[in-house]
Amino acid sequence: MIQEQLAFLPESLPDYRPFPPARERTVWQGLPQRVKDRFLQAGEAALQTPIAPLPLSLWLDFTRTGRRTAWEDAYFSRRARLCALVCAECVEHTGRFLGAIADTVWALCEESAWQLPAHNSYIRDTPQLPLPDTTRPIVDLFAAETGALLALTRYLLPDELDTAAPGITVRMEQELNTRILTPYFTSHFWWMG
Protein backbone atom coordinates (compact mmCIF):
# COMPACT_ATOMS: atom_id res chain seq x y z
CA MET A 1 0.00 0.00 0.00
CA ILE A 2 2.75 2.46 0.90
CA GLN A 3 4.75 1.44 -2.18
CA GLU A 4 1.73 2.25 -4.33
CA GLN A 5 1.44 5.71 -2.75
CA LEU A 6 5.15 6.37 -3.16
CA ALA A 7 4.74 5.96 -6.92
CA PHE A 8 2.71 9.19 -6.95
CA LEU A 9 5.46 11.27 -5.35
CA PRO A 10 7.86 13.32 -7.44
CA GLU A 11 11.42 12.04 -7.93
CA SER A 12 12.73 14.46 -5.30
CA LEU A 13 11.03 16.59 -2.69
CA PRO A 14 12.01 20.14 -1.79
CA ASP A 15 13.59 20.56 1.61
CA TYR A 16 11.02 20.96 4.34
CA ARG A 17 12.16 23.56 6.83
CA PRO A 18 9.63 24.43 9.51
CA PHE A 19 12.31 26.67 11.03
CA PRO A 20 16.06 26.99 10.58
CA PRO A 21 18.77 25.05 12.39
CA ALA A 22 20.35 26.87 15.33
CA ARG A 23 23.46 27.76 13.32
CA GLU A 24 21.31 30.09 11.17
CA ARG A 25 21.25 32.86 13.73
CA THR A 26 19.13 35.54 12.09
CA VAL A 27 15.74 33.95 12.78
CA TRP A 28 16.64 32.79 16.28
CA GLN A 29 18.01 36.19 17.22
CA GLY A 30 14.91 37.82 15.75
CA LEU A 31 12.49 36.04 18.08
CA PRO A 32 10.63 38.36 20.45
CA GLN A 33 12.64 38.94 23.62
CA ARG A 34 9.87 37.52 25.84
CA VAL A 35 10.02 34.25 23.86
CA LYS A 36 13.81 34.06 24.12
CA ASP A 37 13.60 34.81 27.85
CA ARG A 38 11.02 32.07 28.35
CA PHE A 39 13.14 29.54 26.42
CA LEU A 40 16.26 30.45 28.40
CA GLN A 41 14.41 30.32 31.71
CA ALA A 42 13.05 26.85 30.92
CA GLY A 43 16.49 25.67 29.75
CA GLU A 44 18.18 26.94 32.90
CA ALA A 45 15.58 25.18 35.04
CA ALA A 46 16.19 21.98 33.06
CA LEU A 47 19.94 22.29 33.71
CA GLN A 48 19.16 22.20 37.43
CA THR A 49 16.85 19.19 37.11
CA PRO A 50 18.46 15.75 36.92
CA ILE A 51 17.31 13.28 34.30
CA ALA A 52 14.49 11.29 35.87
CA PRO A 53 15.38 7.63 36.34
CA LEU A 54 13.19 5.01 34.66
CA PRO A 55 13.91 1.83 36.62
CA LEU A 56 12.28 -1.47 35.82
CA SER A 57 10.26 -1.21 39.03
CA LEU A 58 8.25 1.69 37.57
CA TRP A 59 7.38 -0.34 34.46
CA LEU A 60 6.46 -3.33 36.61
CA ASP A 61 4.33 -1.12 38.85
CA PHE A 62 2.05 -0.59 35.86
CA THR A 63 2.20 -4.30 34.96
CA ARG A 64 1.19 -5.30 38.50
CA THR A 65 -1.21 -2.53 39.49
CA GLY A 66 -2.25 -0.67 36.34
CA ARG A 67 -0.99 2.62 37.81
CA ARG A 68 0.39 4.74 35.00
CA THR A 69 1.54 7.91 36.73
CA ALA A 70 4.91 6.87 38.19
CA TRP A 71 6.32 5.71 34.86
CA GLU A 72 4.67 8.41 32.80
CA ASP A 73 5.77 11.26 35.10
CA ALA A 74 9.42 10.24 34.73
CA TYR A 75 9.04 9.43 31.02
CA PHE A 76 7.47 12.77 30.12
CA SER A 77 9.83 14.78 32.33
CA ARG A 78 12.78 13.45 30.31
CA ARG A 79 11.21 14.62 27.08
CA ALA A 80 10.19 17.99 28.49
CA ARG A 81 13.76 18.42 29.75
CA LEU A 82 15.19 17.77 26.29
CA CYS A 83 12.74 20.15 24.65
CA ALA A 84 13.57 22.95 27.09
CA LEU A 85 17.32 22.44 26.69
CA VAL A 86 17.16 22.37 22.89
CA CYS A 87 15.06 25.54 22.69
CA ALA A 88 17.44 27.32 25.07
CA GLU A 89 20.51 26.26 23.09
CA CYS A 90 18.90 27.37 19.83
CA VAL A 91 18.27 30.81 21.31
CA GLU A 92 21.62 31.26 23.07
CA HIS A 93 23.85 29.09 20.84
CA THR A 94 26.90 29.21 23.11
CA GLY A 95 27.15 25.50 23.92
CA ARG A 96 26.08 25.99 27.53
CA PHE A 97 23.21 23.50 27.18
CA LEU A 98 24.88 20.96 24.87
CA GLY A 99 26.25 18.63 27.53
CA ALA A 100 22.84 18.31 29.16
CA ILE A 101 21.21 17.86 25.75
CA ALA A 102 23.64 15.05 24.90
CA ASP A 103 23.05 13.39 28.29
CA THR A 104 19.29 13.53 27.80
CA VAL A 105 19.48 12.26 24.22
CA TRP A 106 21.65 9.40 25.44
CA ALA A 107 19.18 8.58 28.20
CA LEU A 108 16.33 8.39 25.67
CA CYS A 109 18.41 6.21 23.34
CA GLU A 110 19.18 3.88 26.26
CA GLU A 111 15.52 3.35 27.18
CA SER A 112 14.39 -0.21 26.54
CA ALA A 113 11.20 1.03 24.91
CA TRP A 114 9.68 4.31 23.81
CA GLN A 115 6.06 3.15 24.08
CA LEU A 116 4.21 3.51 27.35
CA PRO A 117 3.63 0.40 29.48
CA ALA A 118 -0.11 0.94 28.95
CA HIS A 119 0.46 0.59 25.18
CA ASN A 120 2.76 -2.44 25.30
CA SER A 121 0.73 -4.76 23.08
CA TYR A 122 0.62 -5.55 19.40
CA ILE A 123 -3.11 -6.20 19.12
CA ARG A 124 -5.80 -3.73 20.17
CA ASP A 125 -7.82 -4.49 23.30
CA THR A 126 -5.55 -7.31 24.43
CA PRO A 127 -3.63 -7.37 27.70
CA GLN A 128 -0.33 -5.52 27.68
CA LEU A 129 2.83 -7.58 27.71
CA PRO A 130 4.63 -7.47 31.08
CA LEU A 131 7.87 -6.11 29.59
CA PRO A 132 8.86 -4.53 26.27
CA ASP A 133 10.39 -6.71 23.58
CA THR A 134 13.50 -4.78 22.56
CA THR A 135 13.79 -6.86 19.38
CA ARG A 136 10.31 -5.88 18.22
CA PRO A 137 9.61 -2.21 18.96
CA ILE A 138 6.06 -0.96 19.24
CA VAL A 139 5.23 2.32 17.54
CA ASP A 140 2.56 4.03 19.60
CA LEU A 141 1.81 7.73 19.73
CA PHE A 142 4.47 8.33 22.39
CA ALA A 143 7.19 6.31 20.68
CA ALA A 144 6.51 8.34 17.53
CA GLU A 145 6.59 11.55 19.56
CA THR A 146 9.96 10.55 21.03
CA GLY A 147 11.24 9.84 17.53
CA ALA A 148 10.02 13.24 16.36
CA LEU A 149 11.71 14.97 19.30
CA LEU A 150 15.04 13.26 18.59
CA ALA A 151 14.77 13.98 14.86
CA LEU A 152 14.02 17.63 15.57
CA THR A 153 16.93 17.83 18.01
CA ARG A 154 19.24 16.38 15.38
CA TYR A 155 17.88 18.75 12.74
CA LEU A 156 18.32 21.85 14.90
CA LEU A 157 21.76 21.07 16.35
CA PRO A 158 23.55 18.47 14.17
CA ASP A 159 27.11 19.80 14.17
CA GLU A 160 26.83 21.19 17.67
CA LEU A 161 25.75 17.80 19.06
CA ASP A 162 28.54 15.93 17.32
CA THR A 163 31.06 18.45 18.64
CA ALA A 164 29.76 17.99 22.19
CA ALA A 165 29.45 14.20 21.90
CA PRO A 166 31.13 12.83 18.75
CA GLY A 167 28.95 10.24 17.03
CA ILE A 168 25.79 10.94 18.98
CA THR A 169 23.82 11.88 15.86
CA VAL A 170 24.70 8.49 14.36
CA ARG A 171 23.25 6.84 17.46
CA MET A 172 20.12 8.97 17.17
CA GLU A 173 19.67 7.93 13.54
CA GLN A 174 20.19 4.26 14.43
CA GLU A 175 17.54 4.43 17.14
CA LEU A 176 15.10 6.25 14.87
CA ASN A 177 15.57 3.61 12.18
CA THR A 178 15.34 0.69 14.60
CA ARG A 179 12.46 1.94 16.75
CA ILE A 180 10.33 3.99 14.36
CA LEU A 181 11.04 3.76 10.64
CA THR A 182 11.71 0.02 10.25
CA PRO A 183 8.77 -1.09 12.43
CA TYR A 184 6.48 1.41 10.72
CA PHE A 185 7.36 0.13 7.26
CA THR A 186 7.59 -3.59 8.11
CA SER A 187 5.03 -4.26 10.86
CA HIS A 188 1.31 -3.85 11.18
CA PHE A 189 0.01 -2.00 14.21
CA TRP A 190 -3.65 -1.94 15.15
CA TRP A 191 -3.90 1.82 14.63
CA MET A 192 -2.94 1.43 10.96
CA GLY A 193 -6.44 0.17 10.20
Predicted regions and their residues:
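Extreme N-terminal leader/anchor segments
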Residues: 1-39, 87-90, 97
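Asp/Glu-centered strand-loop micro-motifs enriched in Gly/Pro and often flanked by an aromatic residue
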Residues: 29-77, 86-91
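Non-membrane alpha-helical segments in proteins
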Residues: 77-91, 103-107, 144-155
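Solvent-exposed loop and edge beta-strand segments that line ligand/cofactor-binding
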Residues: 13-16, 65-78, 90, 127-144, ...
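Basic/polar, acidic-poor N-terminal "presequence/leader" segments
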Residues: 1-11, 68-69, 112, 118-141, ...
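Long, well-ordered core segments of solenoidal/helical folds
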Residues: 43-54, 101-119, 167-192
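Active-site lining segments of carbohydrate-active enzymes
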Residues: 129-193
